[in-house]
Amino acid sequence: MVKRSFPLLGLNCAACAAHSTKALESTPGVQSATVNLASATTFVVYDETQCTPEMLRAAVAAMGYDLRIDEPEVGELEVLRQREERALQRKTLVAVILSLIVMVLMMWPPMTLPKSLISAVLAAVTLIWAGSGFFVRGWRQLRAGAAGMDLLVMLSTSVAFVYSLYHLGEYLFIAPEAHHLHHLYFEAALMTVAFVLLGKVLEARAQRRTSSALRRLMGGQPKTVHQLLPSGEVITLPVSEVEPGMELRALPHELFAVDGEVISGESYADEQLISGEPIPVAKVAGSEVYAGTLNGSGALVYRAREVGRATVLSRIIRLVEEAQSSRAPIQQVVDRVARVFVPVIVLIAVLTFFVWGLLSPADGWEHGFVAAVTVLIIACPCALGLATPTAIMVGIGRGAEEGLLVRNAEALEAAGHVDTLVLDKTGTITEGRPEVKAIRWCSAEENTSYATILAALEERSSHPLAGAIVRALGVSTQGVAEPTTFREEAGRGLEGVVDGVTYRVGQRAFVEELSGALSAEALKALEEGERSGATCSLFARSGEVLAVILIADTIRATSAEAIASLRARGLEVIMLTGDGPSAARAVGEAVGVSRVVDSVRPEEKAAFVEGLQKEGRRVAMVGDGINDAAALARADLSIAMGSGSDLAMETAMVTLRSSDLKALERFFHLAHTTLRTIHQNLFWACIYNLIAIPVAAGVLYPFTGYLLNPMLAGGLMMLSSLSVVTNSLLSARRQR
């Protein structure tokens, strides 16, 4: 399956997005398609053996939309959109000027024939030139059975124009004495086009700000780089020509061009673009550097490792693009409403016309006509369509700036329903760098010989702590017989036979199967170690525990504060660990979690999460290691810490580039703020249409004698969609 994002131009409202989505998903070979109205893009997953980009383009072309299938250079698409925006601004300016002229003519009595003819000509010019896009797209939508905003504009303006033209012709050729010049609505048709175009210009400007975070990420990609040749000469070449293995030079205060490893030099790097952390990171020989991050005051030579689309920055940009194009589950309801919105509005307009005409034969048909046109003008599927995607774009973009990488909109919505947070201890609550604090020998025999045997066994182990134990022992294994048999049990320990003697290293239950009951000395060392919060591993042979190994991981300085904030949000925070009860309880009490679950083996983590879900809980799992991947995949919301493995990050719905748990609290704040903004936007969009459409139909006329002017309706329609975009932009401040 191919996953690809395409620019989709010509979208005007929620109905446009809904119908184009349906057309794309109906194309053979397409597994899924999402259309983002705010970013004017579509993200399609399709089988390239059954479907081609040309087929996708043809699927939406029939409805008047332009799907760009060529691969644009960086910034090329932005230039194209700016060009279209300038063309839209020119049309808007002309439409507004002509509308003002006509409005003055129509409002300055008496309404003479020359004024009417001038108004008709100016209205025709505006509709044919400035409003041509609405008519072309509206006609195509009508033919394709995919009614959208363009169709509403086409119907309302053409009906008003033709109606006015009819009365003008009647006055000229049939009954000049009938004074029908007072039944002309050229200004309504003109002002409708002007208001809609003006609204589109303002929306485009506001929507550009919703994607500002993504543009800042893209701006972190330098265009050129300094290559250091074997001869010592330095040349400048485009970043696109850099290959892995090349030696590059980073001058002071210069952006790193690709991911790589420092060969020589010392400096600091500002990695806030990648991690969200403002503190500069020291860079020396062997340190990793990342594309888009800023070198400090020192010069560095580094070897290119990941280039082009493989860099961390490029992966982040792709992730953000995909996430911003994704649909929240609530958007599916909006899409269903959008598909029937325009046909329902047209039906309401027709009913309005006939109800007025039948109930008030004297002047009802005239009032009915005005009310029907006003209904067509004031109805706004745009606000409905922009409510969710603009909020998501702002939220996900803001998160990316802070090092919170959200894979899709579902993650934001899932965060709003989570009630239980499961934290893996190692690497999440703690630093993830356990060290051997002490080795308490319990044997009366020479410890050195056993130390070399323990070192020989640990050298063959794949456990992350094996190296730390070998370093803590500080003995040479030369001259020690190779273990004749060796095996490891995940989550329990290892067993090996040296010189015919069987040894075990690991958890108490595993070791006691060989050693029997612990001696008083071993039990005392074990209890003291666990009370201090250390993880204890036992080393034993048949019938005897030889040593107790105390291993401890430093608790992160901010863990307790972050957990307190998370609990204040109403979350139950559970710490999951493979440590024994005493050690686990000591860490849990230190950071203030709601509940501690100890002695959990790696393969049991997913089952524990599933058990919570069976209790009716919505679970978020936070982890950083390979052994967390299954639990992350099982959780309702999966979150990988920045220090974690690639597998954990691939599995997770959210990746925190920082290893600080306070980033987790920031994510939940971001998610809740984004969801609140979506609900506010949808509430406003729905309330606007529920109130505006009946008022436009004339429901207040029997009580107040007031009938809404079509020009005022156009202004309200413009403000409704603009208010939704503005509210989404303001949410960026609330997310800080």
List the predicted regions and their residue ranges:
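Conserved ATP-binding TGD loop and adjacent catalytic N/P-domain core of P-type ATPases
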Residues: 1-2, 18, 406, 500, ...
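Conserved catalytic phosphorylation-site environment of P-type ATPases
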Residues: 274, 333, 370, 380-457, ...
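ATP-driven catalytic headpiece of P-type ATPases
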Residues: 293, 419-462, 492-574, 653-654, ...
